[in-house]
UniProtKB/Swiss-Prot annotation:
This is Large ribosomal subunit protein bL31. It comes from the Bacteria. Part of the 50S ribosomal subunit. The keyword DNA damage does not apply. The gene is rpmE. PROSITE patterns: RIBOSOMAL_L31.
């Protein structure tokens, strides 16, 4: 096996949507970094049965603004 080809595997903190925190090991970021989840098993529609819109940092608004002129025109316009 080749040496020095594997990423650093270290401990990080994970914060769920309800504020619950736990530690796990990952190759993400640096040791001690925090991963904040937008959707987790406690809030995901597949497990809760409730649909909710998550707009992280205005991405949905930015998308709508960018493509607002590409819709189907109605007869009223």
């Amino acid at each position: 096996m080749k040496d020095n080809i594997h990423p650093d595997y270290h401990e990080i903190n994970v914060v769920m949507t309800d504020g619950t925190e736990y530690k796990t090991r990952s190759t993400m970021g640096k040791a001690g970094d925090t991963l904040r989840l937008d959707i987790d098993p406690k809030s995901h529609p597949a497990w809760t049965g409730v649909h909710r819109m998550v707009d992280t940092a205005g991405q949905l608004a930015k998308f709508k603004k960018r493509f607002e002129g590409f819709g189907i025109k109605s007869d009223n316009s």
